[in-house]
Amino acid sequence: GPLSPLLANIYLNEYDWEMARRGVPVIRYADDIVVLAKSKRAAERLLETTRRYLEGKLKLKMNVGKSKVVSVFAIRNFKFLGFALGKGKNGIYIRAHTKSLKKAKAKLKELTSRSQGRNVRVVMQKVKVYIRGWLGYFGIASMKTTMREWDKWLRRRYRSYIWKQWKKPKTRAKSLMQLGIPEWQARAVSNCRKAYWHMAKNGHVQRAISKERLARAGYYSILDRYESVHLCD
């Protein structure tokens, strides 16, 4: 629960001071700890020192399965607090870990589910709240290309959502015509029986439910938000 990180900080404060006294750089959030060392031998020694201190002095059980020595230069990346940290051709990088991205996209998919039957503006507001919170944490990560792809994906999700809500061919044709699609094209598209997701990519549907119209309806661009909070590149 919310109290657990606070209790961990209080209880492990003694460990922080001990490592600081020894001149050992430590990054810690609650009970997730990264201990930095200059060599593999030093890292292995510090891992054992940490285990003895936590288990002997503080009477805590260290998860041996999750505790290991890694080099940010020798491996592709390592995961910490939902981030993937490593070194690439352009130097050290911080990215959202694959698992974090997968979890976030699953949540967005859930929030934009066509089965909920809510007004699309209500759905957009819920998505906006989630995006702001998620990027408030992960906005430091380098992932502009991913955010651009998600932006397109979300707009398509909304188009398929709206297309389903229009339900009947007559309603779809009328709505398309009101949004500027010629009658003969609107009627042809409205009678198409292809899946909602497929129809969301139809040129006439995209023109009717354009990026600008979605924005006026309350669409919150995940790419724009990312660019406004990401200050590291």
Predicted regions and their residues:
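Non-catalytic terminal/accessory segments
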Residues: G1-D233
